[in-house]
Amino acid sequence: MPAASDKPVVTRFAPSPTGYLHIGGGRTALFNWLYARGRKGTFLLRIEDTDRERSTPEATDAILRGLTWLGLDWDGEVVSQFARKDRHAEVAREMLERGAAYKCFSTQEEIEAFRESARAEGRSTLFRSPWRDADPTSHPDAPFVIRMKAPRSGETVIEDEVQGTVRFQNETLDDMVVLRSDGTPTYMLAVVVDDHDMGVTHVIRGDDHLNNAARQTMVYEAMGWEVPVWAHIPLIHGPDGKKLSKRHGALGVEEYQAMGYPAAGMRNYLARLGWSHGDDEFFTSEQAMDWFDLGGIGRSPARLDFKKLESVCGQHIAVMEDAELMREIAAYLAAARKPALTDLQAARLEKGLYALKDRAKTFPELLEKARFALESRPIVADDAAAKALDPVSRGILRELTPMLQAASWSKQDLEAILTAFASEKGMGFGKLAAPLRTALAGRTVTPSVYDMMLVIGRDETIARLEDAAAA
């Protein structure tokens, strides 16, 4: 049988549906997706919903929405772990038949009494079942669990692509339960059975699962199954180096969508959280697929840096095709529960993207810069901009308006008219631009007056200048 690393790559993302898709889970899914896609492999999605009390359909939907927004498409149908419980139980019984597991009739009370006694005597509290080597003829007619018969000497070695060689002394591991007394499988069994049956070749997951790898390796070996390639990635910490929590800001992937970050920028930034390709900070998803490898993942926790996130997202907005950018803005408005753009607003915005998209790090920032194109008359100036409209400035606007009405409405013609007018009046262009910004946008900081005029058109420009002159 070929080694897992020599077979076509199959990765998987296996979240528990107990809440939203955490940003750490989003990065784990991304790493699995990049590794599979870059090797023309398969990326699978499994929902680990065996905890029926905590698992909810709403959480599953939230996970799927988060992955879809990130652009992480999976292959085949979504697998439900709970739906495979009969298969898990079948494997537990096969382990019994192989002598790799045994029935344990010890009650919870007996196990707790053992541990209390061990603590009192200063002994290890690791439970050693008296039923491990018991003659089956001595088995009582009573409820039992099935425990894996773990080796009690030697060591289990994990060759991890990120963590390196990790050794576990077998004497420190107990005979874990694989099937409960009610016939339901434990997570530790279910995950191995599912990964084997789904043909997973590479298990890429958080390093909080590293200890599980030793026990799961024992299950693989007990069943004579090939052990996958392990890659346990470090967790994400906050900017202060502490475990990521709500006090650090948004935790859910969908929150980032609602805050207006572009999905391509999020993929880029999350890929750089813990993985590197030289000094490259900005790259496309296609480049990431080509470059991504497990050897580039560091062992230390990555720190979330919102300034870097915004910088990367700004670069992605700047290079987006206009049609794609308009689609993403529409999706952002829907996710943030904000009113959709009218046809007129959308037309003006798309017309002005050339002057806006290299100035914004998020969609809200872009839309704020585009307010001049989205607002309807009369334009209400803020306090700072209103100061530029004194009687002299209003007179200038009244005098300028007829000249603009006759313009060809090209940037070159508008620039020539405004420059000549300012020169004729003996004023610097900045002094002319100030009342124009107020009239057109009601703000002191705007795109260039030429860009604003071109975006909103001749009629709207003249109407806004006339409104301001008459105010």
From Swiss-Prot:
GO cellular component, one term: cytosol
A Pfam family hit: Anticodon_2
Molecular function as annotated in GO: ATP binding; glutamate-tRNA ligase activity; tRNA binding; zinc ion binding
Enzyme class: ligase
GO biological process: glutamyl-tRNA aminoacylation
Keyword field: Aminoacyl-tRNA synthetase, ATP-binding, Cytoplasm, Ligase, Nucleotide-binding, Protein biosynthesis
Subcellular location: Cytoplasm
Entry-linked Gene3D superfamilies: 1.10.10.350, HUPs (3.40.50.620)
'KMSKS' region, short sequence motif: residues: 243-247
EC number: 6.1.1.17
Motif 'HIGH' region, residue range(s) on this chain: 15-25
Binding residue positions for ATP: K246
Reaction it catalyzes: tRNA(Glu) + L-glutamate + ATP = L-glutamyl-tRNA(Glu) + AMP + diphosphate
CDD domains assigned: GluRS_core
Job of this protein: Catalyzes the attachment of glutamate to tRNA(Glu) in a two-step reaction: glutamate is first activated by ATP to form Glu-AMP and then transferred to the acceptor end of tRNA(Glu).
Subunit structure: Monomer.
Family: Belongs to the class-I aminoacyl-tRNA synthetase family. Glutamate--tRNA ligase type 1 subfamily.
Protein's name in the database: Glutamate--tRNA ligase 1
